[in-house]
Amino acid sequence: VSIDLLKHLSNRYQEELKNISDDMAMGKAEDHGAYKYACGIYRGLLIANNIVAETAQNMQASEDE
């Protein structure tokens, strides 16, 4: 896995997070269930993005040694 790939994934996650955030701010959830679902997707993407960022940092630190 390359750091460039991890950066690309992180950028895509951030794009999706912004899209979901914008949709939620505009009230696009049809009901409470849809809102909860969007919140779950948002949280999952945040977790995935944090894991990718941490992995990239660890790889960068390994390369610097």
Task: Label each region the model flagged.
Residues 1-27:
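N-terminal acidic leader/helix
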Residues 64-65:
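Charged interaction scaffolds used for protein-protein
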Residues 29-61:
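Short, charge-rich amphipathic interface segments used for partner binding and complex assembly
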